[in-house]
């Protein structure tokens, strides 16, 4: 009987193949251990620059390091975190509230800018200018306790839906921005919202939707 002994060339090929398999397995394990920090973002220079910025900021001992108690990230809301079409969500809430409150304010039927809202006359409302807008916001945001106003906001958001997507407005948030908020927080940033919308309208739901506390 003769035993076939592989030649040195074959042994080298087998050894190299085994090394390649180990290297590929290690690479796959390494990738699995490092989840994508911004999974809904397309790979590209914008995503890379965000990740690189955060890595610089959190790297102790580097010129770019920022202590955790000084890390903040500030976001706009309308058009940045959620949809602003076909109109600002708070404005839709305000006009609906004017129509509901008008049942106890019959004089609004003849007073501008309330008359314009009740008749859906957006040109007349636009012509009322900043002063008209202020009157509407004062009428809808005053005369109630903080808790009562919060309840009215939450009830409205629970029942009203986007005319095109037929989904609650709080569902129409941008997932990439939610990923970004979460990524900053995981790296010690405190997140804030600066918006043209009123804080009374936003505070009741920003914690649930964005993870941003109502402070």
Regions found by a protein language model. Give the residues of each.
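Bacterial N-terminal signal peptides
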Residues: 14-27
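N-terminal secretory signal peptides that target proteins for export/translocation
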Residues: 1-13
């Amino acid at each position: 009987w003769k035993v076939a002994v592989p030649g040195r060339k074959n042994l080298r090929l087998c050894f190299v193949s085994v090394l390649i398999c180990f290297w590929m397995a290690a690479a796959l394990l390494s990738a699995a251990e490092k989840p994508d920090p911004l999974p809904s973002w397309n790979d590209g220079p914008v995503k890379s620059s965000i990740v690189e910025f955060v890595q610089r900021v959190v790297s102790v001992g580097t010129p770019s390091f920022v202590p955790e108690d000084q890390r903040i990230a500030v976001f706009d809301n309308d058009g940045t975190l959620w949809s602003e079409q076909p109109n600002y969500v708070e404005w839709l809430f305000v006009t609906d509230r004017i129509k509901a409150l008008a049942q106890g304010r019959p004089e609004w039927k003849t007073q501008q800018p309330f008359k314009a809202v009740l008749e859906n006359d957006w040109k007349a409302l636009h012509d009322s200018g900043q002063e008209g807008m202020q009157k509407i916001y004062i009428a809808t945001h005053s005369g109630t306790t903080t808790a009562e106003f919060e309840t009215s906001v939450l009830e409205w958001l629970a029942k009203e839906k986007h005319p095109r997507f037929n989904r609650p407005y709080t569902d129409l948030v941008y997932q990439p921005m939610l990923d970004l908020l979460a990524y900053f927080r995981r790296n010690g940033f405190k997140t804030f919202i600066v918006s043209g919308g009123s804080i009374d309208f936003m505070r009741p739901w920003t914690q649930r939707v964005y993870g941003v506390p109502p402070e």
